[in-house]
């Protein structure tokens, strides 16, 4: 065991050789490096697998021995200051390491196929390897300075990966937005770290917690200043985990490749904020006001993310807002002091959401064969539908992930989300109502995504896709961006769908066309010819095995990973793995952890939460499932016509929800108006002051001197005697003025 912990410092550096060798190889031997690109993929997977085995071994030891190991090296700069760096291994570290490596390995396997056509294939794997190193370094850090160092590296990797297709203006803007937003959080985190060091004189976690708690108990420091430092520490996780109000970067981050969304924006990077709050929870927990702020930010994010996901057309943006909402659940649990349930949901959500993102990537990959390589088309759920018979394996995996996220037993997220909902009932009735209501909204928008994507018929061929929208048909695009025309409810839906559309287009002719190699200079990768004069329709196809295999593995995780947190610790049974791993753990709501679970209460609460989820699924079914199948006679719409006043109120509500969701809750607009425009006005005023006032004074002195010289030259007539006469005259006048003022004092 000692040898295992002794060499744990190497964990973050095991994946590092790949990005280093790729960088050197592309610089010195570009042709050979590119020809061996599959070898780099295998090496990345192999090295990350070593870290995974190492992390599993550490976790098994901690389950049975409940030990924490820390090793620190000191670098003494002078007698008063020394920098300490090392590694810290505890259950939280081992859990995060397993999460990073398992999802990372599967994403690397997936990316080998998904990115195979891309000219930046090797650059992608170099970024991925560097990101894995940064994330592993973050979770094994023993002090706040190391955390901040790797925190910044993670942010840099996120910037590079979001802007991977940097020739597309949208992707370039998205990575800049993510970078700037996270810099705001990082600045707050840095101020908090410096403030804590000024108070305690230490960066080490263990020393920091002990000194901080002593200060609080003995009232030896200003509580307001301590609270301010703790809040500044929390600002970093607010930005990194996309919590309100610094969540605005996450949906735009979907402009990166889909495997990045699965790894960084579902399982690891956005979980870094949750990790840091969990790591610093012994510090936050002694300040009740900070704990309440954490829970408040969490519950606001839970509701906001769910409402913003209600009317998204882009499948990845819908999943991004779902991620934001689920991260809010974790932050809520940490704010309530429910350490175990927060980390449990972190684990279950990571695998479920990674499955959903990889499933969406498989769908996008299939749709690109029909609509081209434009994300506006291939990711648009309005153009999908009826994919069940075309991509059955992807559909099954996506359905399991959707059911898990909705909280349907016995899938993974049911167990963790149910714990958070139960704890919210003990913490605050208002928070419990919001959390439970959002569980219903989660089921609604997730099955909205599922129905729009997989049920009905392929909508691509029901829409005039020649660049203009068919007004009558486009009104069927539920909550589309420009849905101006109301649906005429005086005729049935079947004639509307089967009407003759003379401009119906096919998107591939019988010939095969190559993709242009000059990809880097194009905004989108486009197919050279769509054969618009043909009437042959092509349909999506199932993805290759290297795309399906990671999805099936994640499906197994989604089915069974919840078992590690099921409370089996009844009389004669002791099988609660997660509780063993987090012993001793922090829980303000269940202080007596030895009590057995009341299964009657558990079943009652579970029935309530599942009923809410089922109700959300039913509403989604009523609104989205019938349009091509079960409600062909427009029964639902006809029922609304019978109660005209209710129908008007219903339409107003739907329009309000759509506008709220489409405009992102007006948070981006608020930031643009109040912050960005204000900064631009200030920059213009500063530019004016600098050029007109500061430069004006300098230039004015120079111009004045120039004109005085010219006047003097003109008066002197270019003769030395005239210059001497003027010089002596000026000196005489100056002496007379000085003499006059000198004698005036007397």
Swiss-Prot record:
EC number(s) recorded for this UniProt protein: 7.1.1.-
Name one process (GO BP) from the record.
ATP synthesis coupled electron transport
Q: One Pfam annotation, family name?
A: Proton_antipo_M
Entry function: NDH shuttles electrons from NAD(P)H:plastoquinone, via FMN and iron-sulfur (Fe-S) centers, to quinones in the photosynthetic chain and possibly in a chloroplast respiratory chain. The immediate electron acceptor for the enzyme in this species is believed to be plastoquinone. Couples the redox reaction to proton translocation, and thus conserves the redox energy in a proton gradient.
Q: What is its main location?
A: plastid
Q: Which Gene3D superfamilies match?
A: 1.20.5.2700
Print the keywords alphabetically: Chloroplast, Membrane, NAD, NADP, Plastid, Plastoquinone, Quinone, Thylakoid, Translocase, Transmembrane, Transmembrane helix, Transport
Please state where this protein is localized. Answer: Plastid, Chloroplast thylakoid membrane
Reaction(s) the record says it catalyses = a plastoquinone + NADH + (n+1) H(+)(in) = a plastoquinol + NAD(+) + n H(+)(out); a plastoquinone + NADPH + (n+1) H(+)(in) = a plastoquinol + NADP(+) + n H(+)(out)
**What terms describe the molecular function in GO for this protein?**
NADH dehydrogenase (ubiquinone) activity; quinone binding
Q: Which NCBIfam families match?
A: NDH_I_L (TIGR01974), PRK06590.1 (NF005141)
Species this protein is from:
Crucihimalaya wallichii
Lineage of the species this protein comes from: Eukaryota, Viridiplantae, Streptophyta, Embryophyta, Tracheophyta
**Subunit (UniProt):** NDH is composed of at least 16 different subunits, 5 of which are encoded in the nucleus.
The portions of this protein that span the membrane are: 9-29, 40-60, 89-109, 125-145, 147-167, 185-205, 221-241, 258-278, 280-300, 327-347, 354-374, 396-416, 425-445, 547-567, 608-628, 723-743
* Family assignment from sequence similarity: Belongs to the complex I subunit 5 family.
Task: Give the matching InterPro entries.
Answer: NADH_UbQ_OxRdtase_chlpt_su5_C, NADHpl_OxRdtase_5_subgr, ND/Mrp_TM, NU5C-like, Proton_antipo_N
Question: Where is it found, in Gene Ontology cellular component terms?
Answer: chloroplast thylakoid membrane
Q: What is this protein called?
A: NAD(P)H-quinone oxidoreductase subunit 5, chloroplastic
What gene name is listed for this protein? ndhF
Membrane topology category: Multi-pass membrane protein
């Amino acid at each position: 065991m000692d040898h295992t912990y002794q060499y744990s410092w190497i964990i973050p550096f095991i994946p590092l050789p790949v990005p280093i060798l790729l960088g050197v190889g592309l610089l010195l031997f570009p042709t050979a490096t590119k020809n061996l690109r599959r070898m780099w993929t295998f090496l990345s997977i192999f090295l990350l697998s070593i870290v995974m085995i190492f992390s599993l071994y550490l976790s098994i030891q901690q389950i049975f021995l409940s030990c924490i190991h820390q090793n620190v090296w000191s670098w003494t700069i002078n007698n008063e200051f020394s920098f300490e760096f090392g590694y810290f291994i505890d259950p939280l570290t081992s859990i995060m390491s397993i999460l990073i490596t398992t999802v990372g390995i599967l994403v690397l396997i997936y990316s080998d196929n998904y990115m195979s056509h891309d000219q930046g294939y090797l650059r992608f794997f170099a970024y991925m390897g560097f990101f894995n190193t940064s994330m592993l370094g973050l979770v094994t850090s023993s002090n706040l300075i190391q955390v901040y160092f790797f925190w910044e590296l993670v942010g840099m990797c996120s910037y590079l990966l979001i802007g991977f297709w940097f020739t597309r203006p949208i992707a370039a803007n998205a990575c800049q937005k993510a970078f700037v937003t996270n810099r705001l959080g990082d600045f707050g985190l840095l101020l908090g770290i410096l403030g804590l060091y000024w108070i305690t004189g230490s960066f080490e976690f263990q020393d920091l917690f002990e000194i901080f708690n002593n200060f609080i108990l003995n009232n030896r420091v200003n509580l307001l200043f301590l609270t301010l430092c703790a809040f500044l520490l929390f600002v970093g996780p607010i930005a990194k985990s996309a919590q309100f109000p610094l969540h605005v970067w996450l949906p735009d981050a979907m402009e990166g490749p889909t495997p990045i969304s699965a790894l960084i924006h579902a399982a690891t990077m956005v979980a870094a904020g949750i990790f840091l709050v969990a790591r610093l929870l012994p510090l936050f927990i002694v300040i009740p006001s900070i704990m309440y702020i954490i829970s408040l930010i969490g519950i606001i994010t839970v509701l906001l993310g769910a409402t913003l996901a209600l009317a998204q057309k882009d499948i990845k943006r819908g999943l991004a807002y779902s991620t934001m909402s689920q991260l809010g659940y974790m932050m809520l649990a940490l704010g309530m002091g429910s350490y175990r349930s927060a980390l449990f949901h972190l684990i279950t959500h990571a695998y479920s959401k990674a499955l959903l993102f990889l499933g969406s990537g498989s769908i996008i990959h299939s749709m690109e064969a029909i609509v081209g390589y434009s994300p506006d088309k291939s990711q648009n759920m309005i153009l999908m539908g009826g994919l069940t018979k075309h991509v059955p394996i992807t559909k099954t995996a996506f359905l399991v992930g959707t059911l898990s996220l909705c909280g349907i037993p016995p899938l993974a997220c049911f167990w963790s989300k149910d714990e958070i909902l139960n704890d919210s009932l003990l913490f605050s009735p208002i928070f419990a109502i919001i959390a439970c209501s959002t569980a219903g909204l989660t089921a609604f928008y997730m099955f909205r995504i599922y129905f729009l994507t997989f049920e009905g018929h392929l909508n691509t061929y029901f829409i005039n896709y020649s660049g203009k929208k068919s007004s009558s048909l486009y009104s069927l695009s539920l909550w589309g961006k420009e849905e101006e025309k109301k649906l005429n409810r005086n005729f049935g839906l079947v004639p509307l769908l089967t009407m003759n559309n003379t401009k119906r287009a096919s998107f591939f002719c019988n010939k095969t066309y190559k993709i242009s190699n000059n990809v880097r200079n194009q905004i989108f990768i486009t197919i050279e010819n769509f054969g618009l004069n043909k009437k042959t329709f092509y349909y999506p196809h199932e993805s290759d095995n290297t795309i399906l295999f990671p999805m099936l593995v994640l499906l197994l995780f989604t089915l069974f990973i919840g078992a590690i947190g099921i409370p089996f610790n009844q009389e004669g049974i002791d099988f609660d793995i997660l509780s063993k791993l987090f012993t001793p753990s922090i829980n303000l709501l269940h202080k007596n952890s030895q009590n057995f679970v009341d299964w009657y209460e558990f079943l009652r609460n579970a029935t309530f939460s599942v009923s809410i989820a089922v109700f959300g699924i039913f509403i989604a079914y009523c609104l989205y499932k019938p349009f091509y199948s079960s409600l062909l006679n427009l029964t639902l719409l006809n029922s609304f016509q019978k109660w005209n006043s209710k129908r008007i109120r219903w339409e107003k509500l739907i329009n309000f929800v759509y506008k709220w969701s489409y405009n992102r809750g007006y948070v981006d607009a608020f930031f643009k108006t109040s912050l960005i425009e204000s900064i631009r006005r200030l920059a213009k005023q500063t530019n004016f002051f600098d050029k007109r006032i500061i430069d004006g004074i300098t230039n004015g002195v120079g111009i004045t001197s120039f004109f005085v010289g010219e006047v003097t030259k003109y008066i002197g007539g270019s003769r030395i005697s005239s210059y001497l006469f003027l010089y002596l005259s000026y000196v005489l006048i100056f002496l007379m003025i000085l003499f006059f003022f000198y004698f005036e004092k007397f």
